[in-house]
Amino acid sequence: MATIVDPRDIILAPVISEKSYALLDDNVYIFVVHPDSNKTQIKIAIEKIFAVKVASVNTANRQGKRKRTRTGYGKRKSTKRAIVTLAPGSKPIDLFGAPA
């Protein structure tokens, strides 16, 4: 991705798991992102979508798991995850859409 057309094309979905839920207290959020996006694009997209200040972005490429199917073996698609740390004093991101 050479240029950012829409920040919502970069941030695909939040990761909701026990680990990511525990990290919410530390202002750390995990998102599934576009595989071709870089840390700078992810930071700009998070700041535009959620109106927060990002302190750091770490990324991890996850290989798709090999799964059995009726006809043999298949493979889940590989994903890229971004671990986003918000700056101190930044408001939290509402991932669950609860009324304020």
Swiss-Prot record:
BP GO terms, sorted? translation
User: Which residue stretches, if any, does this entry annotate as coiled coil?
Assistant: none
Q: Which domain of life is it from?
A: Bacteria
Q: Which Pfam families match?
A: Ribosomal_L23 (PF00276)
Keywords tagged on the record:
Ribonucleoprotein, Ribosomal protein, RNA-binding, rRNA-binding
GO MF annotations in UniProt: rRNA binding; structural constituent of ribosome
CC annotations in GO = ribonucleoprotein complex; ribosome
Please list every transmembrane segment annotated in the UniProt record, as residue ranges: none
What NCBIfam families has UniProt attached to this entry?
PRK05738.2-4 (NF004363), PRK05738.2-5 (NF004364)
Name the PANTHER family on file. 60S RIBOSOMAL PROTEIN L23A
Its job:
One of the early assembly proteins it binds 23S rRNA. One of the proteins that surrounds the polypeptide exit tunnel on the outside of the ribosome. Forms the main docking site for trigger factor binding to the ribosome.
Q: Oligomeric state and partners?
A: Part of the 50S ribosomal subunit. Contacts protein L29, and trigger factor when it is bound to the ribosome.
The record's comment on protein family reads: Belongs to the universal ribosomal protein uL23 family.
> What protein is this chain from?
Large ribosomal subunit protein uL23
Q: Which gene encodes it?
A: rplW
